[in-house]
Amino acid sequence: SFDFQEIKIHLLDTPGYPDFLGHALPALAAVETAAIVINAQNGLEMMTGRFVQWAAKRGLDRLIIVNKIDAENVDLEALLERIQQAFGRECLPLNLPAGKASKVSDCFFAPSGESDFSSVEDAHRKLVDQVVEIDEKLMERYLEKGEVTPEELHEPLERALREGHLIPVVFTSAKTGAGIGELLE
């Protein structure tokens, strides 16, 4: 457990190996959000899909964390595509690796900068499109104005997460700290 910006966060770290499945599944009953960590070097593994499915069946918010973005010989763009193929178009990046994976660029709250692949602006647009689909009035305003404020997106974002309409993908490096601050935000 730790405090972050006056919010108490409890992390339950469970094993991802099939041999320890009996230790991992009971934790799903005690959490609001299932954060599924994918090692960028290994990509999608057999248990990754199962954990995503089990979390969905329990109605949990799901978050996919791609770690080790700074490792050698990783194709993060291809990994993101595989994640979307495996778990659906609702898997959208909240940030994208930048500076040869030494940092990340925010795609939702304050989109700016470049990324190592893809366009931050395109990623932002896809996220906003996905979130506004949850609220008809907000969608109408968005279609009229072409943009909505972060304040207008707050409640629909939470609803999209709760309803599984959005599964955020966050790129991080535990080794260098890239993306960790953004993940906590």
Language-model-detected regions and their locations in the chain:
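Redox-cofactor binding/interface segments in oxidoreductases and associated redox assembly factors
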Residues: 36
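P-loop NTPase catalytic nucleotide-binding module
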Residues: 40-185
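Switch I (G2) and immediately adjacent beta-strands of P-loop GTPase domains
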Residues: 1-33, 47, 53-56, 60
